[in-house]
């Protein structure tokens, strides 16, 4: 830490102006420390980040915590470095905030290894261009919305359709099957949800393989605009230094953009369309471009995307779409049928649902499943008005198979065992493809629909029917 000391000259909400001696201005993105007794009794407990040089030896900074209690003339220490996060084993099983301080009440976190949160994206020469499928063990995702290793997937869904459970199951499967690390970034989410997630992960035993980095709705915009970068830094350490395949969950990526918009006007920038910051694309790009596969390891991202007023043309979701490799859409109609995970098989898309990446057989089966379900959807109006008896024999077979496929897309989850009483199942991709192929080929037309509900592989369905 340098011995450069400045003083507070102006406070405007989350934005603080600090004056330094001539020739001693800290660089942009440098972390400065102020002691704010309103937060707690610790020294240097408020971190502010340099955003602009205003002239007259004054820098404009964004606060990472509340600025209530700051007064003009307060001393400000220059750390000479950006905000840093504790990385490696120290971050696992813990809940940290944007500046790497623990918020779980379990004592201090070792800062033996730290990394700055602002880092360049990997160079083109370091990036891995081969496309590999990341097996999640969740049938509907592996079959119809395959995740590219090192890719970015968007998870779209309203409240109560199962986003969190799918996330937790993925954390569990990556930890159990791949021995992988997961990082969860809670960006501007409800504190209650963050608390629930922590306790559920603790109870299901996946917490030791995960790092939770939270910046909830109550935090100032500075923290919410940086917490995704803090979490990504933890993930990058596991990828670049330990050569791991890491999964990062960001809930919610919209709040990252929203926080940037909140501080943008205070920094004197002219707002862009719909009041967003003019730097929207570059802010989001700086985060998204760091999420990639390199020759050392990979970071695969699952991002929850809130769509304001269901308007997909809003600049925030529209800019996010440009970065995504695929979208998993969760449907309330499917959840109402009791089918979980409630992924909409006709609305969800993946860039790598292509024979060149997943193989001819997988591609053919996936498309056949979608065609059967689409035909069933088209026939539903006729069935509702005239009943099943008016359908042709061919259509009756299609409807019966579609209903079996629909039920077979459900699956018992490990993390939901406590609620359902059913043991969870992890299904390998080859078993998933084979199972769905057998249903499409009519091999199991004699089994009742109920046999396909909440089972793993097709063998479990056959055993359930014999039951």
Swiss-Prot record:
InterPro entries: AAA+_ATPase, ATP-synt_VA_C, ATP_synth_F1_bsu, ATPase_a/bsu_AS, ATPase_alpha/beta_chains, ATPase_F1/V1/A1_a/bsu_N, ATPase_F1/V1/A1_a/bsu_N_sf, ATPase_F1/V1/A1_a/bsu_nucl-bd. GO terms for molecular function: ATP binding; ATP hydrolysis activity; proton-transporting ATP synthase activity, rotational mechanism. It catalyses: ATP + H2O + 4 H(+)(in) = ADP + phosphate + 5 H(+)(out). ATP binds at residues 157-164. It comes from the Bacteria. It is a peripheral membrane protein. Its main location: membrane. Keywords: ATP synthesis, ATP-binding, Cell inner membrane, Cell membrane, CF(1), Hydrogen ion transport, Ion transport, Membrane, Nucleotide-binding, Translocase, Transport. It is found in: Cell inner membrane. GO terms for cellular component: plasma membrane; proton-transporting ATP synthase complex. The keyword NADP does not apply. Gene3D superfamilies: 2.40.10.170, Bovine Mitochondrial F1-atpase, Atp Synthase Beta Chain, Chain D, domain 3, P-loop containing nucleotide triphosphate hydrolases. Its EC number is 7.1.2.2. F-type ATPases have 2 components, CF(1) - the catalytic core - and CF(0) - the membrane proton channel. CF(1) has five subunits: alpha(3), beta(3), gamma(1), delta(1), epsilon(1). CF(0) has three main subunits: a(1), b(2) and c(9-12). The alpha and beta chains form an alternating ring which encloses part of the gamma chain. CF(1) is attached to CF(0) by a central stalk formed by the gamma and epsilon chains, while a peripheral stalk is formed by the delta and b chains. Belongs to the ATPase alpha/beta chains family. Produces ATP from ADP in the presence of a proton gradient across the membrane. The catalytic sites are hosted primarily by the beta subunits. This is ATP synthase subunit beta. It comes from Desulfosudis oleivorans (strain DSM 6200 / JCM 39069 / Hxd3).
């Amino acid at each position: 830490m340098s011995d450069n000391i400045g003083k507070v000259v102006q406070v405007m909400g989350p934005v603080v102006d600090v004056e330094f001696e001539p020739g001693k201005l800290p660089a942009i993105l440098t972390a400065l420390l102020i002691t704010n007794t309103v937060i707690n009794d610790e020294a240097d407990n408020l971190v502010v980040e340099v955003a602009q040089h205003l002239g007259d030896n004054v820098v404009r900074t964004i606060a990472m915590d509340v600025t209530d209690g700051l007064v003009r003339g307060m001393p400000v220490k220059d750390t000479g470095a950006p905000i840093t996060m504790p990385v490696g084993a120290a971050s696992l099983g813990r809940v940290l905030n944007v500046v790497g301080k623990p918020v779980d009440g379990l004592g201090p976190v070792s800062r033996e290894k730290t990394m700055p949160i602002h880092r360049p994206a990997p160079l083109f020469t370091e990036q891995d261009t081969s496309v590999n499928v990341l097996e999640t063990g969740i049938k509907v995702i592996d079959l119809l919305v395959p995740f590219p290793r090192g890719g970015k997937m968007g998870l779209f869904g309203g409240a109560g359709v199962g986003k969190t459970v799918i996330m937790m199951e993925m954390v569990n499967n990556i930890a159990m099957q791949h021995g992988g690390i997961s990082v969860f970034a809670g960006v501007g989410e409800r504190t209650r949800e963050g608390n629930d997630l922590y306790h559920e992960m603790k109870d299901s035993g996946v917490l030791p393989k995960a790092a939770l980095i939270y910046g909830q709705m109550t935090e100032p915009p500075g923290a919410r605009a940086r917490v995704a970068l803090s979490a990504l830094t933890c993930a990058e350490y596991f990828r670049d230094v330990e050569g791991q395949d890491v999964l990062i969950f960001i809930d919610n990526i919209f709040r990252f953009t929203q926080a940037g918009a909140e501080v943008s006007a205070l920094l004197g920038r002219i707002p862009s369309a719909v009041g967003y910051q003019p730097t929207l694309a570059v802010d989001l790009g700086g985060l998204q471009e760091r999420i990639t596969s390199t020759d050392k390891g990979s970071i695969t991202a699952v991002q929850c995307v809130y769509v304001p007023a269901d308007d997909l043309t809003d600049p925030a979701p529209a800019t996010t779409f440009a970065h995504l490799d695929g979208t998993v859409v969760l449907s309330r109609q499917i959840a109402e049928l009791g089918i979980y995970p409630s992924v909409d098989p006709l609305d969800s898309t993946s860039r790598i649902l292509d024979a060149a990446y997943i193989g001819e057989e997988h591609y053919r089966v996936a498309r056949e499943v979608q065609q059967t379900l689409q035909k069933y959807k088209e026939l539903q109006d006729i069935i509702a008005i005239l009943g099943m008896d008016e359908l042709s024999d061919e259509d009756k077979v299609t409807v019966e198979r579609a209903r079996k496929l629909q039920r077979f897309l459900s699956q018992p989850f490990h993390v939901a065992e406590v609620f359902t009483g059913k043991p969870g199942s992890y299904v390998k991709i080859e078993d998933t493809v084979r199972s769905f192929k057998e249903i499409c080929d009519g091999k199991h037309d004699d089994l009742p629909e109920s046999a396909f509900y909440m089972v793993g592989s097709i063998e479990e369905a056959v055993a359930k029917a014999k039951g």
